[in-house]
A protein has these predicted regions:
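Conserved loop-alpha-helix segment in the C-terminal half of the alpha/beta-hydrolase fold
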Residues: 217-264
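Flexible "cap/lid" loop of the alpha/beta hydrolase fold
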Residues: 117-122, 126-164
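Catalytic active-site module of serine/aspartate enzymes centered on a nucleophile-bearing elbow/loop
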Residues: 251-283
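Gly/Ala-rich beta-loop-alpha elbow adjacent to hydrolase catalytic centers
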Residues: 108, 112, 116
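Conserved acidic catalytic loop of the alpha/beta-hydrolase fold
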Residues: 86-104
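Conserved alpha/beta-hydrolase catalytic His-Asp/Glu region
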Residues: 165-205
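Conserved HGGG/HGGXW glycine-rich cap/lid loop of the alpha/beta-hydrolase fold
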Residues: 17-81, 95
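Short beta-strand immediately N-terminal to the catalytic nucleophile in serine-hydrolase-like folds
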Residues: 106-108, 133
Length: 283
């Protein structure tokens, strides 16, 4: 499969590629040894998002972070498939099988939390434990016919995508990132994060056309593995509501909050986040 990847990217000694049964070649980084721990990135991100986790948790686990199809560095790796959360669920399950990893400790953030949640539902034999950090997606509340993102959030994301489509990439990214974190988050973010988001800006319009599925009491009841839910103390209300509700719906779920942090809590407070994950998995 033809993938255009900069030579400097291939120089990363931790970078490898897994060829899946579907034909997709999925890039990933791996570090450490021991029980396998797989990290699933969210919107505008890729395997680089998890650098603070691999740097620490690889002392205890075989840490593996893939970039899902359509994301950097191999934006053409999944070109034959539509961008969709279900395709990402399927390919992540294939990825775990291809590397003969399962069952794994699965960690997902934001949109990646939704993907990880649905891998645990649809492929329970592949997941030993599940950690969801600010999981993205709407909540299906009892008595409500159809769950969806709040209208204000949807309108803002649509405006952000329109800016990107018009070539005002950084303005669109700033609007989106601030909306899922807190005002000023984009300007305060590191140049490394901004570079990663710009590299993945083309995925945001695709994401808007593919709404995440709702969490419901019924779907949460399908989660059979040990589960940890993490939110940031300053994360937007929709993420904190997801963590609050899922911690009640998923049997025997544990819950932790990263003090002083917003949506990117794993990067803002990596020592605390890593401790929560390690203590949960090792218990």
């Amino acid at each position: 499969m033809n993938m255009r990847i900069e030579p400097s990217v291939l120089a990363n000694p931790d970078l490898q590629f897994a060829t899946l049964s579907s034909g997709i070649s999925l890039p990933y980084v791996e570090r450490g040894s021991g029980a396998p721990m797989v990290f699933v990135h969210g919107s505008l991100c890729d395997y680089r998002y998890w650098d603070p986790q691999l740097a620490s948790l690889s002392a205890h686990y075989r840490c593996i972070a893939p970039s899902l199809s359509h994301y950097w560095p191999a934006v053409e790796a999944g070109i034959q498939d539509e961008f969709s959360w279900q395709n990402h669920v399927d390919e992540l399950a294939e990825f775990i099988d291809a590397l003969d990893l399962g069952p794994v400790h699965l960690v997902g953030h934001s949109r990646g939390g939704s993907v990880a949640f649905n891998v645990a539902r649809q492929h329970p034999h592949l997941v030993e434990s599940l950690t969801l950090a600010d999981p993205g997606g709407p909540l299906q509340q009892p008595g409500v016919r159809e769950a969806a993102l709040p209208a204000t959030a949807l309108a803002l994301r649509t405006k952000a995508v329109n800016l990107i489509d018009q070539g005002e990439v950084e303005a669109g990214l700033e609007m989106f990132v601030d909306s899922v974190s807190q005002p000023g988050a984009w300007k305060k973010s590191t140049s490394r994060f901004r570079t990663m988001a710009i590299d993945n800006a083309s995925t945001l319009p695709k994401q808007l056309r593919d709404p995440l599925p709702a969490y419901s009491q019924h779907t949460a009841g399908d989660i059979a593995c040990r589960t940890l839910l993490i939110d940031g103390q300053r994360s937007p209300k929709m993420f904190r509501n997801n963590v609050d509700t899922l911690s009640q719906w998923i049997g025997n779920a544990q819950r932790q909050t990263v003090a002083g942090a917003s949506h990117g809590m794993n990067a803002a407070s990596p020592a605390v986040f890593n401790r929560f994950v390690h203590e949960f998995v090792a218990a």
